[in-house]
Amino acid sequence: MRESLALSAPTVMIRCMMRILHLADVHLGASFASFGPHAGERSEAVLKAFRNLPEVAREHEVHAVLVAGDLFDSPRPDERNAAEAREVIRQLLEVAPAVFLVPGNHDPLVIPGPYADIPETAHVFSAPVPGEAVSVDTEAGPLHVYGFAYDFAHEPDPLARFRRADAEGVHVALVHGAVRDAPHWSGGDSLRLSHDELSTLGVDYIALGDYHRFRPPSEFAADGSVPACYCGSFAALDHTETGPRGVVLVEVSPDSPPVVRLLPSGVPPLQALADLDVSTCSDDLEVVEKVAGLVEVGSLPVVTLSGQTEFAVDPERVEAGLAARFPFARVRDRTRHYDSDRLAELSSRDDVVGHLARLGLDRIRAASDEVEEGLRERALRKALRAMGVT
């Protein structure tokens, strides 16, 4: 039975480990332009996985749900995505005693605002500074959640106003912002955070959103003294977001480090195959076979090819071959070919092709560094392919 948001007594002991579902950066309504022709299919896959969240909450018997910003990709989502969010949150409220949300830098509070039609029983933090905690009594005991809607114009340093309540139970801070030492974009309009600020909050868990890679508490402090966690993006928004994506299941109790587990969203993840040596391959089709054999079931390949080859790799052809097997594939070519036997043979020819090969080799050898060398080699390959030379 769902319990009242009001605490049933001034002091209520924790009855069991509290389980919280923590998500952020779903970006409903994103274009997924990086996925090219697969963009529409990708968008539908995200919506399908998002609709499954109530079942995830039910399966894990969570006591609360936290949404740490950027639920939407813009402050004015289209009606379909707004309706999807309303329905999912309505169903989540049938499973968990409470759902808490903060806006992010992509979906800030405007008028009418992206969260205007969210069910009233969900709590959206709309003040620009953290105030008193919103408290709910759960089957695991009292939960106190602190949050705010960051607005630099109103309060550039909202965490300076944070005050933890002196109350029994689990205390959680819900924050959308970028930790300064994270490998994160340097600009933007997100709240900037520091380890020191997070460590002084005195709460049992800090549910973070904005940074798109899963970062468990151990990445903030090995001893558990900073109980912060980025759940990462719900699903990869572009081809750079490789690896597992989803939501975090948190088990937390007062005065002990939280235990977190990343639950895959169910949207096909991007699998990075970095520096894949294809020097033993004899042609593009063999490269396709080698890559395909390394892709995990249900994943989409993002591969960087490397090695010294005896043929000029055609990354567009390799990518097309992979796209015939997977809904999406991205290929980056970093192979070396300029000092191969084939190119030496071409440079010995007494024709336009030979002249081009010799000129290209001279420019490659005169490059000032490896980056410039690679650029000049790839330019030579493209020029040779344009002349029908493989």
State what each model feature region is:
Residues 5-7:
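Leucine-biased recognition of intrinsically disordered, low-complexity hydrophobic segments
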Residues 21, 144-146, 248:
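Conserved beta-strand elements of the Class I
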Residues 22, 67, 101, 173, ...:
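Structural beta-sheet core signal
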Residues 3, 13-14:
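Short, positively charged and aromatic/hydrophobic N-terminal segments
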Residues 16, 254-390:
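Accessory, non-catalytic peripheral segments of nucleic-acid enzymes
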Residues 35, 64, 75-229, 233-238, ...:
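His/Asp/Glu-rich metal-coordinating catalytic cores
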Residues 14-83, 167, 372-390:
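N-terminal active-site segment of His-dependent metallophosphoesterases
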Residues 213, 218, 224-227, 231-281, ...:
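Glycine-rich, Lys/Arg-enriched anion-binding loops that position phosphate/diphosphate groups
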